[in-house]
């Protein structure tokens, strides 16, 4: 039986033809300006996800998707974080770098692409710790086998914890030629490195600290990747000194290498580190200062002085406060120096030693003053001798010049310029 042109053939569902796939095997994506190449099977590996809906072969949606000028499928999302989405689509796992700062943004991308399992993997890291809990020290220190000490978070630390170490290091170089050359290149410091606790480094250097190599770190953590925006060591030392730091150690290593085999110039390169430390404020001297101001300067009828009052006040305060915050001042033993006409005081061994020390100091002072006077006199004599020597040299020059005799008549010269010169000066 023949069928008319308006009739169409019926295919049952189990025997129907498969819907052709309009997507190529390798798909080129443009995600926020970043270009990615991936397989079509990777994009549709997780059912009911957004990428599965976009690139599913059951619907012909290839013409509905946005494309850029080069025909690549365009997705208006973060191109940097999309690499982790692709990693998860490949093997259901994602490996993030250490101290990854954009975990929250990656979680938002996973929610957008409708990947619930990836959202669960990223969710536990977003839970904030309560203030009563403690956090461990740096993961880098723990991985290197250091002591895993437990330290409280920055919110629980006392406000006056401002003590610690800061290490300042630099790699410098200088070129020195032969002695007497003026074109020698002096010290060159390309970069000043800063190591230590982040809170201390920010307190000392402030806006001059470059944190681009180690950003988004807690203030109580330690770093060795900060450096300063200026190149003057003395400026860094001044800033450390103004904040109460003093240098406790330093080390340096120097190497020399020739510029080339034809010259004697040497390039000296060195790496130097300076360790600075600021001590904690253990006690305050305000109470003792107040007692000294209120007390009498001279001894009164009771025989007590300002020092006695200050020591007694310090003793009373040391009993009330903790031993870590105060310094206990011991009692001051004083000897009575009462003298009468009937009974002269015998000089003890201590007084004899003190007198000998005073004599020794006076003798040393005399020798120093006499030495300085002699040096001044000798310097004046040397200056006078130098002046005389200059005058003598001038006199010798004048005498030598007077001894020069110019002949009345010069012999004839062979060259014409010589005769012209003689005629010019009428010789």
From Swiss-Prot:
Chain positions with Phosphotyrosine modification: 112
Domain of life where this protein originates: Eukaryota
Phosphoprotein in keyword set: yes
Annotated keywords: Cell membrane, Cell projection, Membrane, Phosphoprotein, Postsynaptic cell membrane, Synapse
Entry-annotated residues carrying Phosphoserine: 130, 137, 143, 146
GO biological process terms held by the UniProt record: behavioral fear response; memory; protein homooligomerization; regulation of G protein-coupled receptor signaling pathway
Location(s), subcellular: Presynaptic cell membrane; Postsynaptic cell membrane
Residue ranges occupied by any BTB domain in the UniProt entry: 25-98
UniProt main location, coarse: membrane
Summary of the tissues where the protein is detected: Expressed in the brain, mainly in the hippocampus.
GO molecular function, one term: G protein-coupled neurotransmitter receptor activity involved in regulation of postsynaptic membrane potential
GO cellular component, one term: presynaptic membrane
Function: Auxiliary subunit of GABA-B receptors that determine the pharmacology and kinetics of the receptor response. Increases agonist potency and markedly alter the G-protein signaling of the receptors by accelerating onset and promoting desensitization.
Self-association state and partner proteins as the record states: Homopentamer; forms an open pentamer. In contrast to other BTB domain-containing proteins, does not interact with CUL3. Interacts as a tetramer with GABBR1 and GABBR2.
The name this protein goes by in its record: BTB/POZ domain-containing protein KCTD16
Organism listed in the record: Mus musculus
């Amino acid at each position: 039986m023949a069928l008319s042109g308006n009739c169409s053939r019926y295919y049952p569902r189990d025997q129907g033809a498969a819907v052709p796939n309009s997507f190529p095997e390798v798909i080129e994506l443009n995600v926020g300006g970043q270009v990615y190449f991936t397989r079509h099977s990777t994009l549709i590996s997780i059912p009911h996800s957004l990428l599965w809906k976009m690139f599913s072969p059951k619907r012909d949606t290839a013409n509905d998707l946005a494309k850029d000028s080069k025909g690549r499928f365009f997705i208006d999302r973060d191109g940097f974080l999309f690499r982790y989405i692709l990693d998860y689509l490949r093997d259901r796992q994602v490996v993030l770098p250490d101290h990854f700062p954009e975990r929250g943004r990656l979680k938002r991308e996973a929610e957008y692409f409708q990947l619930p399992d990836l959202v669960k993997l990223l969710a536990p890291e977003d839970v904030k710790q309560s203030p009563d809990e403690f956090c461990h020290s740096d993961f880098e220190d723990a991985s290197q086998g250091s002591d895993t000490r437990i330290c409280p978070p920055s919110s629980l630390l006392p406000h006056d914890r401002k003590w610690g170490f800061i290490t300042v290091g630099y790699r410098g170089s200088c070129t020195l030629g032969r002695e007497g050359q003026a074109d020698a290149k002096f010290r060159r410091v390309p970069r000043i490195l800063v190591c230590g606790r982040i809170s201390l480094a920010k307190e000392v250097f402030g806006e001059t600290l470059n944190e681009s190599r180690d950003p988004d770190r807690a203030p109580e953590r330690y770093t060795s990747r900060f450096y300063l925006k200026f190149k003057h060591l003395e400026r860094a030392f001044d800033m450390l000194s103004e904040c109460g730091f003093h240098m406790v150690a330093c080390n340096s290593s120097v190497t020399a290498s020739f510029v080339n085999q034809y010259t004697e110039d040497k390039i000296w390169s060195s790496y130097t580190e300076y360790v600075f430390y600021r001590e904690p404020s253990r006690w305050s001297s305000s109470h003792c200062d107040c007692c000294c101001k209120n007390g009498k300067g001279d001894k009164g009828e009771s025989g007590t002085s300002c020092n006695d009052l200050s020591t007694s006040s310090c003793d009373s305060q040391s009993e009330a406060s903790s031993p870590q915050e105060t310094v206990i001042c011991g009692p001051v033993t004083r000897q009575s120096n009462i003298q009468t006409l009937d009974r002269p005081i015998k000089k003890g061994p201590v007084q004899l030693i003190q007198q000998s020390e005073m004599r020794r100091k006076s003798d040393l002072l005399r020798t120093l003053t006499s030495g300085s006077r002699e040096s001044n006199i000798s310097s004046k004599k040397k200056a006078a001798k130098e002046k005389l020597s200059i005058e003598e040299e001038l006199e010798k020059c004048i005498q030598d010049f007077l001894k020069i005799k110019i002949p009345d008549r010069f012999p004839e010269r062979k060259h014409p310029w010589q005769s012209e010169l003689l005629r010019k000066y009428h010789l």
